[in-house]
């Protein structure tokens, strides 16, 4: 019977992961590539328990979605933001593996090369 209990526990876990992924899917942007979405969905799902909206509202989920966009925009599009905000989202994303990220050159780097 122990095997049956373990199997039921695994099925419950898989079902929960599926439900969470289905829930997150509604927040995918039309313009996001599969790679961008997978990374951002991992960011969202990782922090979803801490950002669930309280019964009286409060916008915690909106805050999480905004933070996920800041992180994705910085990573994939090279957008820059306030240092404190970037520090926060980079800390939140610690451990999320993203391969083949684009490389960006800042204006300052271009100016230094031009002056050399």
UniProtKB/Swiss-Prot annotation:
Residues 24-116 form the XRN2-binding (XTBD) domain. InterPro entries: XTBD. Keywords: Acetylation. Belongs to the CARF family. Interacts with XRN2; the interaction is direct. Pfam families: XTBD. The modification N-acetylmethionine is found at residue 1. The keyword Hydrolase does not apply. It comes from the Eukaryota. This is CDKN2AIP N-terminal-like protein. The keyword DNA-binding does not apply. It comes from Mus musculus (Mouse). The gene is Cdkn2aipnl.
């Amino acid at each position: 019977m122990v095997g049956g209990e373990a199997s039921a526990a695994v099925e419950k876990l898989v079902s929960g992961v599926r439900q969470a992924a289905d829930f997150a899917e509604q927040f995918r942007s039309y313009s996001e590539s599969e790679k961008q979405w997978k990374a951002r969905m991992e960011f969202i799902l990782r922090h979803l328990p801490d950002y669930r909206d309280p019964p009286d509202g409060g916008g915690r989920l909106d805050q999480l979605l905004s933070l996920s966009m800041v992180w994705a925009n910085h990573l994939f599009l090279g957008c820059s933001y306030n240092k404190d905000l970037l520090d926060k989202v980079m800390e939140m994303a610690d451990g999320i593996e993203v391969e083949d990220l684009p490389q960006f050159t800042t204006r300052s780097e271009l100016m230094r090369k031009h002056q050399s």
